[in-house]
Structure formats: structure tokens, C-alpha cells
């Protein structure tokens, strides 16, 4: 059978950070992991409630961070995600983050990553929509991006 594609795969930051839907959702998980690897991805962040299971995961640095569908990540999860992506990039390992559809939870984490690099929430969400064609699903997810921004801003003020 011919490989179709991995749904919603796109780079937010070229060859550094991407988002996609659940590997194995439409194809065999191994085919999707091979596809990601062929696109240069070397680190995988899974936001689904269940861990991925495949021997091909050994090709990737893997972080499982379960978040209930249609909800937002907590502060510690966002901080862990940002640190993981930064660490992977320092090791020259482009990362992909996924949830089930690759939109809500994935978009929230991607927007928070943009905020961590100095973007205000409206700009982060605009960039997310430009690059990926999607925004966020729930008010709770938008609020998580806003709260992350204000928490970062408060922490920055305390250091001055």
C-alpha cells in the first residue's frame, strides 16, 4: 500500500520545530515515524494520553507529556516542553509535537514556544495560523498562552 501522509505535519520554525497529528492515526505508526525521520525530525513530544508504542521510536528523543484532549497544558508542562525543545535544538535535533488532531494541544504548546522566544500572544497566534493554518480550539488553551506570557514577563521583571 502506498504511503499517504502524516496529517497536519508542518514546520512552525523551519527545520527546528513542527507540529502534526497522532502518528499512526491514518497510517501504520512505523510508516509515520519513518516519514518524520525522513523530514529531519529527531525529537518527538507526545501530548496524547497514551504513550506511543513502536520500536522505531528508538530513532527519536521522546518525551511523553499526557494532556487531556480539549484542555490546556499546565505551567510545568509548558516549561518542560520549552526546555526539551531548546535542549534538542542545542543537540541539532529538530522536534515535532503532536496530539490527536495536531491542532489544539499541539497549537497551544507551539504558541507557548513562540512566546518563550519573545513573541506576545497575539503575534504568536498569528504566526501559528500563518505557518500551520490553525489557531487554538478552546478558551482554556488561549488562556494558557496568555498566562504563560504574563508569568514569563513577571519572572523577567523580578530579574531586573
PLM regions with names:
Residues 106:
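Ser/Thr-glycine-rich phosphate-binding loops at phosphate-binding pockets of nucleotides
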Residues 1-96, 110-160:
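Cys-dependent protein tyrosine phosphatase-like superfamily
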Amino acid at each position: 500500500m502506498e504511503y499517504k501522509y502524516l496529517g497536519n505535519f508542518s514546520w512552525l520554525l523551519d527545520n527546528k520545530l513542527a507540529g502534526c497529528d497522532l502518528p499512526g492515526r491514518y497510517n501504520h505508526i512505523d510508516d509515520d515515524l519513518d516519514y518524520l525521520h525522513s523530514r529531519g525530525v529527531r525529537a518527538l513530544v507526545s501530548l496524547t494520553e497514551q504513550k506511543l508504542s513502536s520500536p522505531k521510536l528508538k530513532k527519536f528523543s521522546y518525551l511523553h507529556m499526557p494532556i487531556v484532549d480539549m484542555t490546556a497544558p499546565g505551567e510545568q508542562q509548558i516549561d518542560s516542553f520549552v526546555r526539551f525543545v531548546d535542549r534538542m535544538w542545542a543537540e541539532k535535533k529538530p522536534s515535532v509535537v503532536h496530539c490527536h488532531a495536531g491542532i489544539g494541544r499541539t497549537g497551544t504548546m507551539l504558541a507557548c514556544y513562540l512566546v518563550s522566544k519573545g513573541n506576545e500572544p497575539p503575534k504568536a497566534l498569528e504566526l501559528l495560523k500563518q505557518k500551520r493554518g490553525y489557531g487554538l480550539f478552546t478558551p482554556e488553551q488561549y488562556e494558557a498562552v496568555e498566562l504563560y506570557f504574563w508569568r514569563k514577563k513577571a519572572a523577567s521583571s523580578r530579574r531586573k
